[in-house]
UniProtKB/Swiss-Prot annotation:
Keywords from the named record: Acetylation, Glycosyltransferase, Membrane, Transferase, Transmembrane, Transmembrane helix
Top-level taxonomic group: Bacteria
GO CC annotation, single: membrane
Record function comment: Involved in the latter stages of the biosynthesis of the alpha-(1->6) mannan core of lipomannan (LM). Catalyzes the addition of alpha-(1->6)-mannose residue.
Broad class of where this protein is predominantly found: membrane
Annotated source species: Mycobacterium tuberculosis (strain ATCC 25618 / H37Rv)
EC number(s) stated in the UniProt entry for this protein: 2.4.1.-
Subcellular location: Membrane
Protein name, entry field: Alpha-(1->6)-mannopyranosyltransferase A
Single Gene Ontology MF annotation: mannosyltransferase activity
Amino acid sequence: MTTPSHAPAVDLATAKDAVVQHLSRLFEFTTGPQGGPARLGFAGAVLITAGGLGAGSVRQHDPLLESIHMSWLRFGHGLVLSSILLWTGVGVMLLAWLGLGRRVLAGEATEFTMRATTVIWLAPLLLSVPVFSRDTYSYLAQGALLRDGLDPYAVGPVGNPNALLDDVSPIWTITTAPYGPAFILVAKFVTVIVGNNVVAGTMLLRLCMLPGLALLVWATPRLASHLGTHGPTALWICVLNPLVLIHLMGGVHNEMLMVGLMTAGIALTVQGRNVAGIILITVAIAVKATAGIALPFLVWVWLRHLRERRGYRPVQAFLAAAAISLLIFVAVFAVLSAVAGVGLGWLTALAGSVKIINWLTVPTGAANVIHALGRGLFTVDFYTLLRITRLIGIVIIAVSLPLLWWRFRRDDRAALTGVAWSMLIVVLFVPAALPWYYSWPLAVAAPLAQARRAIAAIAGLSTWVMVIFKPDGSHGMYSWLHFWIATACALTAWYVLYRSPDRRGVQAATPVVNTP
């Protein structure tokens, strides 16, 4: 007679011990000398969350604040106080990030340090109202369209009047959804669960972004290891970067899902798990089309695997890799579209970004400069000029991407370099860009751009883009005071890391640009 197995009880006890051990290690790190940047960044995140109640991308009418008699934070002196708290929090978080960056460059930070710090910095932001963007309200309204039997690719939120519509930015109320079926399904899921409750919807939607962050944390060190570069540095660039944490998680952007899925797909592909990698890339495209930039470069990676493992000839390997990748893409995308019950109408909505006019892209910046300098010499219509510069930008993108695809084909490092450059060119020359768009190239460049100059440049650019936008979602690029404050902060960030101590015992990493 056999005795009953106690394996489930043993497994439960083992899991409990593991959780206790991890929490104990996290506590020791947080309270120890290595946890200084983590504690400082946590304080900054708390200030952002507190200040966001009044100065963030708040609702038109906030019954929750009114019910606890805190609505005064949104007006007059209360708004001033909220703004001070929020901007102080941003400054503190940037200081913590730069301080951690100096430790990374000195070789004093580990991957555990990066992961633990991410958890600590993120915790307060999970409770924040949306900051630096009102997009989450549009997401909820678009999800409600699908929930209520309407096609979000055929009608804007205005076609479905409800409580969610009140907080959508006017510019987007008549705009159809420019997102893929996977994200529309996520937004529908949220609105099915919470109904038209904006607060609960915002919190649940933010939680739905967490898998993207987890995938980014998982994939980035693996890509760095595959390329022979420094995992903690890569995590510092693309995960702990306040531009990522504050905008993508604090602001609740679907870029978090897209970037996480895309990076994980790239990591799986370079490790030889090609089918799984292409599936994840396709799901990322079904969140936001930008992830599609990576797909052609991964064909080169798969081609090499077929040649090395199966002895395929170059042309045969290319045709096989391209055909199978295309087949996987079509199949996965068709399934997601069928589940969502939508077609390809979202592709036409991608042009909706032309409504945005700011200096974050070269075409729009060039149009502003030419108009400002030329209006005293000749008559020039700004919007006509803008259409011309944007058309030139699109031509630059259309010419550059195929050239980069062909140029960066030799090995895995080249393929990732090509993806990074392609995404950067798209961000710089697309008709309109927003701060969180810079998370696209950052995620891919993080395992590559690890030379001191590159790290300092990334710190400066990230700081400038972080500071130039306002917590309510507007920007300060037409205010000289705001512009020079952001520029001064960016130069300071660059200098702090450019002059930081050398890494101890760690060989300098390879810069992003490699030779053929």
